[in-house]
UniProtKB/Swiss-Prot annotation:
Family: In the C-terminal section; belongs to the prokaryotic molybdopterin-containing oxidoreductase family.
4Fe-4S ferredoxin-type domain location: 144-171, 187-216
One Pfam family linked to the record: Fer4_7
Protein name: Putative formate dehydrogenase YrhE
Gene name as annotated: yrhE
Sorted UniProt keywords: 2Fe-2S, 4Fe-4S, Iron, Iron-sulfur, Metal-binding, Molybdenum, NAD, Oxidoreductase, Repeat
Positions annotated to bind [4Fe-4S] cluster 1: 97, 101, 104, 111
Taxon lineage: Bacteria, Bacillati, Bacillota, Bacilli, Bacillales
Annotated spans, Disordered: 944-980
Length: 980
């Protein structure tokens, strides 16, 4: 009896077993049958514009991409009717496209139009090519990163479909009502004046050369970059001489093969946010030609954001440090590696000997690889015998991790981004993934737009996700825990909780109900400013949803009660049975490409690699045997405690890698004073950051494109990155530098490649026991989560990470926000902008990004602006008890009343947010309460030019539609259908 999940079809007379529900084209592709499909994008629904995929199914001509196969179906791929229809379809496309493949910038072996024409044996065109628009002015070069040539556009609609329904940025469409249809941006404006957010998805999927990265123009080919007045006669000459396209294609194939000899394509993992996008980087020498995502990428597939696609100029920036620097007589002097490393080792070693093991501290990095983080904690624990090691998760994610450890036993995402996309309801609290985690946000936007997913957003600011949501709530700052607990209490009171799940899986329910007694609807309304009706509506939406995922970020964690609010999120999910199942669970959005990995590798004062606690005697003994030293069973100092220890004179030296502590720590004025007081300070970085300016020695490291290694994303997914470029100047990978320092202090390490380091780490860490470079080869990945070492996409399938396998309700009350004197009457929020990454040390090296966002500014509500006499461009000074900044105002309804918003992408003392923030911190983890800052405002100047250019997409309106709307093409006057 045939499996109901499979069907049988006949393809050109051959019987094939196939998936039930698969389209005919799916079956062809899954069985390796090469077939035309110019407009097909596997990641989206069938586009149905090119008609090159037509087949005959049970005697009818149909589009194979949109026709679901039926059991017993007879499919003909080679009959005369099929071939005639396909040829007509291709002729209609080629009428819109001039074939000049040999001199084309896109002749790189991956041009779908070229390859399909060759596959089909096309020799001549039925319809001669004619341009749609005046060639002298048709090409839109307005955008900093890519260009569009309508006269090469075949109107296949791939770019439109992905913009509308995969990225869901909703900028592109095809004007099917034109005499000659073409792609348009918004209402037909130049690209750079549109709502385009520069994700580059359109360029990635374009099957020809209509959309091209500007960085590719004239760069890839041996015969590209030829001027128009020479190129056009060459094209005409070739067409007149050659008897058909076959000969022309043969020449272009030779040229494409020549390109392969100098164009290197290397798989890498993005170095910006925590989503973990992977893609190919195309290089020629040290030139980065383009970023090309592929369907095999496990997280993003073909998607990117502006930074991942276009934000790599920093790699070749002239501001890179390429030689070691030693401070002599108050100024930096270039030195040799020998001199610099000898000095670092001797000074750090002598300080340890003179002042003791606790006199040296280590700050690791969320930007460097897992392997490099591992050797940094090993340097601290083995060579310096100290647990004084931490990373930037202290500034952001430690409270989320703490809340999860207390409730479910593991500090990571419950599932994957695919689970988020599957959820019936997504709740986003204190996060702005459309700007901070853009590719992850696309999956939520797509599920919400097309698949009925519901969306709740809780934020002080009306960001893009709030605009799209079914319910947007804006509670008073620092009160998220109150409404979360009120929702939980209300659901329990109504009997909407999952009692069976709780009985089987969770401890302390009765104690938890006692804790909830205070959190009535009336209490929550008074504290949060939300209406009781909103709180009830949230409860009802959770009740009705088939799976709830909660995503949260710095708006939760960077508060005095960040850990307890994170625990409250987990409590709500436990009470409603939203763990241990797909499409549900807790998702703290990790901010950096490898902040998850930095923690996983043990660069934490209380944790050894693989989340083995420093107080665990057995775990510690294992590392002691491997390292040959005794490891202190007491946690070391975290980032914040290290600064206190420096101030108190107890810590004399610090070794900091890939972190701009002088800008990212709170109360920056005070931090600067502290760093200046160190006896010896080593900074390892790719730029002379603000922090590096306080160093005694600066060691030049390499960015991700110049080394091998692994990163771990927000899903707990480990992925390999491969060296794409040679190191610049004398810069070295961080793992090499650390090993050289360690060996000068007697360590005798002998790592020859990061794979050696990974193997050692995995041998000591059960979570990674079955991970290896072989497992991670190519596009493969590994998700930690099982102490028997298996890859674990969904956590807790075998129970929660406690001895009895049961989770625990956290019993925590709300902590009030930090108090400020009355004169500080405005609350100032902060966060990322889409175009920039954090303080901008990398993205501010990109001319294109800087053109989109040239300045930092403060967002002010229309109400406050009217009250205080502020307009766009007004110069204002913001003053807190801890410092002051001066910058221009941007009036926007994204903020309301007395709320201000200051993007964090500034390295300037005049405008960086942390010259305002103070010492308040999360009570459990010491994470600074960056979000609890109040200021007063002084208006210094009148109306000037708005600090956000008119060409920034925030000033534009989106144009949503459901994909390409191919029906409009079919309804054009005179359109002749090729299907039956």
């Amino acid at each position: 009896m045939m499996d109901v999940k499979s069907i049988s079809v006949r393809v050109d007379g051959t019987e094939i077993q196939a998936r039930a529900g698969a389209t005919i084209l799916d079956i062809l592709n899954e069985n390796g049958i090469e077939y035309p499909q110019i407009c097909h994008v596997p990641e989206v629904d069938p586009i149905q514009t090119c008609d090159t995929c037509i087949v005959e199914a049970n005697g009818k001509l149909v589009r194979s991409c949109a026709t679901v196969a039926e059991n017993g179906m007879s499919i003909d791929l080679s009959g005369n009717r099929v071939k005639e229809a396909q040829t007509e379809a291709m002729d209609r496309l080629l009428e819109n496209h001039l074939l000049y493949c040999t001199v084309c910038d896109n002749n790189n072996g991956n041009c779908t139009l070229h390859n399909t024409a060759e596959m089909m044996g096309i020799e001549h065109q039925k319809y001669p090519y004619t341009p749609k628009e005046d060639p002298s002015c048709a090409v839109d070069m307005s955008h900093p990163f890519y260009r569009y040539d309508p006269n090469q556009c075949i109107a296949c609609g791939q770019c439109v479909e992905v913009c509308q329904n995969l990225q869901v940025n909703e900028t592109l469409s095809i004007d099917w009502e034109r005499e000659r249809p073409r792609v348009i941006w918004d209402e037909g404006v130049p690209i750079n004046e549109s709502s385009c957010v520069s994700c580059g998805q359109c360029v990635t999927v374009c099957p020809c050369n209509a959309l091209m990265e500007k960085s590719m123009l004239g760069q890839a080919g041996f015969m590209t970059g030829i001027k128009e007045d020479v190129m056009e006669p060459m094209i005409d000459l070739v067409k007149n001489v050659e008897p058909g396209y076959g000969s022309i294609f043969a020449i272009s194939e030779v040229e494409a093969a020549m390109r392969e000899t100098r164009t290197k394509k290397t798989k890498t993992v993005c170095t910006f946010c925590g989503v973990g996008c992977s893609f190919e980087v195309w290089t020629k020498g040290r030139d980065i030609l383009k970023i090309q995502p592929v369907s095999d990428a496990p997280v993003n597939a073909i998607s990117t954001c502006v930074k991942g696609k276009f934000g790599w100029d920093f790699v070749n920036s002239k501001e890179r440090i390429t030689k070691p620097l030693i401070r002599k007589n108050g100024a930096f002097v270039e030195s040799s590696w020998e001199e610099a490393l000898d000095l670092v080792a001797s000074r750090l070693g002598s300080i340890k000997e003179q002042y003791g093991k606790g006199s040296v501290g280590f700050i690791s990095s969320s930007k460097i690889t897992n392997e490099e983080n591992y050797v940094i904690q090993k340097l601290a624990r083995q060579v310096f015998e100290t647990n004084n090691v931490d990373n930037c998760s202290r500034y952001c994610q430690s409270p989320a991790t703490d809340g999860l450890f207390r409730t479910v036993g593991m500090g990571g995402d419950a599932g994957t981004i695919k689970d988020i996309a599957k959820a019936g309801l997504v709740i986003i609290v204190g996060a702005n993934p459309a700007e901070g985690h853009p590719v992850l946000a696309t999956r939520v936007k797509r599920a919400h737009k097309l698949h009925g997913q519901k969306l709740i957003v809780a934020d002080l600011r009306k960001n893009e996700m709030a605009e799209r949501s079914d319910l947007f709530i804006s509670p008073k700052q620092g009160t998220d825990q109150v409404w979360l607990m009120a929702v939980t209490k209300y659901m329990i009171d109504q009997g909407w909780h999952d009692q069976a799940f709780i009985d089987e899986n969770v401890n302390y329910f009765e104690d938890y109900k006692e804790t909830l007694k205070t959190y009535t609807l009336d209490y929550a309304e008074r504290i949060t400013g939300l209406s009781k009706e909103n709180i009830i509506q949230i409860a009802e939406m959770i009740r009705d949803a088939d799976g709830t995922c909660v995503l949260w970020g710095m708006g939760v964690t960077q508060n005095t009660g960040g850990s307890d609010t994170s625990a409250a999120i987990s409590n709500l999910l436990l009470a409603t049975g939203n763990y241990r199942r797909p499409g549900a669970g807790a998702y703290p959005l990790r901010g950096h490409n490898n902040v998850q990995g930095a923690c996983d590798m043990g660069t934490l004062p209380g944790w050894l690699p693989g989340y083995q606690h420093i107080t665990d005697d057995k775990a510690r003994a294992k590392f002691e045997e491997a390292y040959g030293v005794e490891i202190d069973g007491k946690p070391g100092l975290d980032n914040i405690q290290m600064l206190h220890a420096i101030e108190e004179g107890k810590m004399k030296a610090m070794y900091l890698v890939g972190e701009d502590m002088a800008l990212v720590d709170s109360n920056a004025n005070h931090v600067h004073d502290i760093l200046s007081s160190l006896d010896f300070f080593v900074v390892q970085d790719i730029f002379l950051s603000r922090t590096a300016q306080y160093a005694d020695v600066v060691l030049p490291a390499t960015p991700s494109l110049e080394k091998d290694g692994t990163f771990t994303n927000t899903e707990r997914r480990v992925q390999r990155l491969y060296q794409a470029l040679p190191t610049l100047g004398d810069a070295k990978p961080d793992w090499w530098i650390i090993q050289e320092v360690a060996n000068r202090l007697g360590a005798n390490w002998n790592y020859s490649h990061p794979s050696d380091i990974f193997s050692e780490m995995a041998s000591l860490s059960p979570l990674f026991a079955k991970a290896s470079y072989e497992v991670l080869e190519g596009w493969n990945s590994f998700l930690w989560g099982s102490f028997t070492g298996e890859s674990t996409p969904l956590l807790y399938e075998d129970g929660f990470n406690f001895p009895d396998k049961k989770a625990r309700f956290a019993l925590s009350d709300w902590t009030e926000p930090a108090a400020f004197p009355e004169e500080y009457d405005l609350h100032i929020n902060n966060g990322r902008m889409l175009e920039h990454f954090h303080e901008g040390n990398m993205t501010n090296k990109s001319k294109g990004i800087q053109a989109k966002v040239p300045n930092v500014f403060v967002e002010i509500s229309p109400e406050l602006a009217q009250e205080r006499g502020v307009c766009d461009g007004s110069l204002v000074r913001l003053v807190s008890p801890f410092g002051a900044v001066k910058l221009n105002a941007l009036i926007t309804d994204r903020v309301r009343k007395n709320e201000l918003y200051l993007p964090m992408n500034s390295t300037d003392k005049e405008s960086a947010i942390n010259f305002l923030t103070g010492p308040a911190a999360d009570k459990r983890t010491n994470t600074p309460a960056y979000k609890q800052t109040k200021v007063r405002m002084e208006v210094l100047g009148g109306c000037e030019t708005a600090p956000l250019p008119k060409t920034n997409p925030r000033n534009k309106k989106r144009h949503p539609q459901n994909g390409v709307e191919a029906e409009r093409k079919w309804n054009r006057p005179g359109y002749v259908h090729l299907t039956d």
